[in-house]
Amino acid sequence: MDRYHNRSAEILAFAVGLAMVGYVVTKAFSDHLGVDITAGGRLLLALFLALGMIGYAVWNEITDGFIGLRALLPLALSTLWSGMWPAMQYWGTKSLYFPGLPIEDQDLEWWANGYTQWGGWALILFGGYGIAYYTWRAR
């Protein structure tokens, strides 16, 4: 086989296959949680990002890296919290919800509205970094 062979078709087939596997995993995750695929996909992406940040922070703690667990844990948890917002809106609808209707116009429970979402995000992020700063100063 020629070394400089054009492999664009193989790369395209791999990308399409990877997208199909990602769709199937996201659909199964969404069905397991009982939400639509966009809410489940956002939650799954946030979960992967949070686990990646926590894994990177633990790896830096073990290898004496620059960014440790104390620095990345509030960011990882706030990322996970913000990924839950569409699922919380889906679970918190008071009236009947039919797929295709805009969920922003529905009546929501108190824990699914924007004030609780943004307030929880700010509490997790700024409270976490406040605790990290306080424990850093106490050393």
Locations of regions flagged by a protein language model:
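Juxtamembrane "helix-exit" motif on the non-cytosolic side of transmembrane helices
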Residues: 23-35, 57-62, 88-92
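Hydrophobic core of alpha-helical transmembrane segments in multi-pass integral membrane proteins
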Residues: 14-25, 50-56, 121-133
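Cytosolic juxtamembrane helix and N-cap/initiation of the first transmembrane helix
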Residues: 1-19
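Membrane-interfacial loop-to-transmembrane alpha-helix junctions, especially the N-terminal start
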Residues: 7-13, 66-74
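Alpha-helical membrane-associated segments of multi-pass integral membrane proteins
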Residues: 97-139
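Transmembrane alpha-helix entry/boundary detector in multi-pass membrane proteins
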Residues: 7-12, 25-49, 114-117
